[in-house]
Amino acid sequence: MAMPVLAANDEWYSYIKINDMTIILEKDQANIKVNYTIDPGTQLIVYLLGKQDLKNKLLKVLNYEDATVKNVEMNSAEIQINDISYDYGKGIYWFPEHEFNVVIPNLRVVSPQVSREYRNTKKFSDGMGFFDR
């Protein structure tokens, strides 16, 4: 069943509006926690028909290949991505720039050394280097 995309609003993807996202970097892996709102008119349909379409739409929003949905609820999800960072050896990693398919109102990227916060962005620009210790 195809669901129409809501009005031209960069924060919505179909029936999902992203509220905030946290990306926690650990070596070449990322654990992503995303909080969102489901359009009230669609909540019952998602509840009755299951969350597979919701999972697919969240993966489309993130725009990462080979992501794994670890947990999905009606207002949040946990997603894991392996091989997301470049490993330069000796505990040195590079998390490259990335573009999402919607505007993220509050994006937080956390490495073992630093936490960066972005507002109303569709792109994590410039990338970020970090160490595994």
Predicted stretch roles:
Residues M3-R133:
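Lumenal/extracellular ectodomains and adaptor appendage modules
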